[in-house]
Amino acid sequence: MPECPCGSRTGYARCCAPIHDGQRQAVTAEELMRSRYAAFVLGRADHLYRSWHPRTRPPEVELAEVRWLGLTVIEVVGGGPEDETGTVEFVARYRGGSLRERSRFARRAGRWMYLDAE
């Protein structure tokens, strides 16, 4: 079983695949962020669109031709199973550089959704 690209060191089939396929929801904001990173790696624009809050979501999600190399979570504030909001700061490395971002998440109808980034 291939390792999940989210960095969990768990097999993809038991980690982010059930979230990508809609079989279960992310329990925390960090889990949603990791599933979104894995979706970028695997070209799962469908998951990126579904997990983006409708208030801030673009009409469609386009994926750039990027070779993603790894993810490091720096800080998580809130975003737990009982929270309504949360932020996750991370560094995503890709061939030729890196992206450092603080993503904001909010619950909508009980589901974690990506809101925007600072």
Feature map (PLM): residue ranges:
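Short Cys/His-rich zinc-binding micro-motifs
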Residues: M1-T10
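Cysteine-centered loop/knuckle micro-motif
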Residues: R14-C16
